[in-house]
């Protein structure tokens, strides 16, 4: 177990919080903070899970066509983005804050990589790729206008991508990956001190949410690959909380948006049957959900997914 030193000055981290590698350099999972929720706290967290009021998105720049080895169909990417924003407005009832496309930010549509918002705190991340760091410009002002407490990762040794952050409602899992290092995970634990925070090793070019997401207050949607199964096993070892799991054949299809609309309606935005027909069949088992298919074939070519295309927040204020 890895914990914050009680006497660390300036919110620093003791030697126990540095590392994350086992023998032979193999990545290991660690607990950065362990907390136990009481029944009342857990019930409140479940009630708030999937509750959103706003979404922050960015338009598709023409320069996106040069990404993904030039395989991106720009016109289709723009259509898919329009449908996606329509789903956020019409199916989830969100106020959508649209940032204009910026030709200097070819991957700028992936706003969900740039920040995570939990409770009253927004954490602006620090992408490991220097060329993407300008994508965070303007977010601090936006979050301040929404009356959030705003934190920003400024440590130059930290790398943090919000697509590696999975908030379950009661705890936080952070993928330590090509895109997020242990120092970045420590910044998450430092920012959200009311929640247990654990790290999950992720290999290759994947993010943690490349193969998992929340499908309800106590439900994890998980892919079927070895990477997904290993991550799920580590989560089960690290958590004190019980989660139901819904396993889908295709890892990318495990990345969904779960939202609660109104007092009782559960909505799941998932990848379309055109893209992943076998996984779409699995979602049909969720008979008490409103299922909303959404394609993101083009944004997936630049490493994106459904959750990466918006910053979802819960704030009952007008911008």
Where are these regions (language model features)?
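Acidic/polar hotspots within intrinsically disordered regions
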Residues: 7-10
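The feature marks the mature, well-folded catalytic cores of soluble enzymes
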Residues: 2-3, 13-319
């Amino acid at each position: 177990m890895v914990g914050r030193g009680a006497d660390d000055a300036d919110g620093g981290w003791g030697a126990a919080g540095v590392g994350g590698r086992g023998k032979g350099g193999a990545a290991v999972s660690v607990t950065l903070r362990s907390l136990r929720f009481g029944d009342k706290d857990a019930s409140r967290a479940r009630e708030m899970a999937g509750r959103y009021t706003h979404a922050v998105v960015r338009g598709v720049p023409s320069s996106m066509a040069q990404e993904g080895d030039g395989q991106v169909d720009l016109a289709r990417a723009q259509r898919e983005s329009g449908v996606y924003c329509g789903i956020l407005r019409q199916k989830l009832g969100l106020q959508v804050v649209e940032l204009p496309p910026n030709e200097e930010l070819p991957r700028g549509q992936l706003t969900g990589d740039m920040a995570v918002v939990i409770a009253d705190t927004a954490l602006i991340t620090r992408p490991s790729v220097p060329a993407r760091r300008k994508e965070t410009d303007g977010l601090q002002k936006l979050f301040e206008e929404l009356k959030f407490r705003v934190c920003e990762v400024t440590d130059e040794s930290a790398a943090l991508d919000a697509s590696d952050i999975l908030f379950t409602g009661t705890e936080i899992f952070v993928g330590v990956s090509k895109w997020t290092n242990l120092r970045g995970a420590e910044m998450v634990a430092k920012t959200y001190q009311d929640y247990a925070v654990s790290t999950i090793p992720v290999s290759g070019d994947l993010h943690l949410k490349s193969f998992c997401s929340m499908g309800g207050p106590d439900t994890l949607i998980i892919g079927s690959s070895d990477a997904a199964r290993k991550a799920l096993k580590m989560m089960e070892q690290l958590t004190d909380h019980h989660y139901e799991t819904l396993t889908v054949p295709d890892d990318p299809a495990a990345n969904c948006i779960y939202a609660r609309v109104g007092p009782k309606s559960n909505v799941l935005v998932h990848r379309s049957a055109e893209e992943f027909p076998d996984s779409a069949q699995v979602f049909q088992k969720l008979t008490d959900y409103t299922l909303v298919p959404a394609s993101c074939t083009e944004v997936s070519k630049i490493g994106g997914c459904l959750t990466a295309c918006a910053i979802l927040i819960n704030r009952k204020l007008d911008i």
